Amino acid sequence: MSQIPKELEKVIELTREQNRWRRTEVINLIASENVMSPLAETVYMSDFMSRYAEGKPYKRYYQGTKYVDEVETLAMQLMNEITNTKFCDLRATSGTIANAAVFRVLANPGEKALIAPVQAGAHVSHTKFGTLGALGIEHIELPYDADKMNVDVDKAIKMIEQIKPKFIVMGGSLYLFPHPVKELAPHAHAVGAKVVYDAAHVYGLITGKAWHNPLEEGADIMTSSTHKTFPGPQGGAVFSNEEEIFKKVADTIFPWFVSNHHLHRLPATAVTALEMKYFGEDYAKQITKNAKAFAEALAAEGFKVIGEHLGYTQSHQVVLDVRNLGGGAKIAKLFEDANIITNKNLLPYDPPSAVKDPSGIRLGVQEMTRFGMKEEEMREIAKLMREVAIDGKDPNEVKKKVIEFRKNYLEVKYTFSVDLSKYSNGKMLPLLI
């Protein structure tokens, strides 16, 4: 063709604009996102993305998988090492798919599961509106302690003993404080129930020793995604120290929920696991320090920050109640207009019907921490947010400040210093910026 189609030009331009905007010009505070290192991105862009490898390493249904087998095995070994586990499966293509495989193994349709209450942050996949519901498993919420913003342990123990569920689920997506795994696991096991922990949001904190390891506190199996506080490619993972239950889940991931498992994730996951092996503790420690400093700064700037009486947060997340400022939908849009990216979120006291315009804003500091920001930068961000939401300044004027602010934080930290050109063979595919 002598002319490039206009649609092709459009696709390239949209990609370029996305990379420029989200990678270099915004303060990204989405709690479920992160950024890979250039090293991980380099191995992510590979021939693996075009290939299939159904089954397990060295037991495939396709030929041509010898390098897939090696890199997948290495990635699982590294993930087990940093998680202090015996068994890992990386074939789930998301945390929700990992949950689906685990739930399918542990209960049949019509049987009961107890989940952490929605007010305490249960993910939609734990509920009747998500994966549990799709599998026909009856979900019952554990009692909620509003003062502690967590599961009510005493009432939960009684419920476990009374209902005798097939399994209980802890972990969540609005997740400021650890759920009581150690306190509830013995009572679950006493009635024959398994304990599932969804670590999607806090997996990087677990591997960085800034959060409790649920498998060391009584959880039987742990699911996760690989792209939140663990800054790898989007994907899922399953971990356990119990061979019998793990084997059943692994045999369910394929062929029940995954055929090909997006092989280009594997080398990038391995690279990220190595980064977290060597730099993860410093990274996780800084995340939690930043979250605490951010919460305190936001409160000082006049925001209503959830959980003040509990120290605001122990995770990467900070949560605002913005009802007095117009509600979550309005404030999230104002922040976006100023290049501060957040998400509106239901708060513990919101009814489910408020999902389109909830009371809250959920924030996460993990990506900005990866770009080298520390406590002082958190205080600067809090001031910018005040200008938009409380002072009522023009978001376009604040946006100029945000873009200028980000110019000093474009390099990914907590990674290896590597000359990528040595490994590219002239075929590296850089980001279009």
From Swiss-Prot:
(6S)-5,6,7,8-tetrahydrofolate binds at A122, H123, V124, E244. Its EC number is 2.1.2.-. Keywords: Amino-acid biosynthesis, Cytoplasm, One-carbon metabolism, Pyridoxal phosphate, Transferase. It holds the Pfam family SHMT. The modification N6-(pyridoxal phosphate)lysine is found at K228. Pathway: Amino-acid biosynthesis; glycine biosynthesis; glycine from L-serine: step 1/1. Signal peptide: none annotated. It is found in: Cytoplasm. It comes from the Archaea. One of its GO terms (cellular component) is cytoplasm. InterPro entries: PyrdxlP-dep_Trfase, PyrdxlP-dep_Trfase_major, PyrdxlP-dep_Trfase_small, Ser_HO-MeTrfase, Ser_HO-MeTrfase-like, Ser_HO-MeTrfase_PLP_BS, SHMT-like_dom. The keyword Amino-acid biosynthesis applies. Belongs to the SHMT family. Homodimer. This is Serine hydroxymethyltransferase. The gene is glyA.
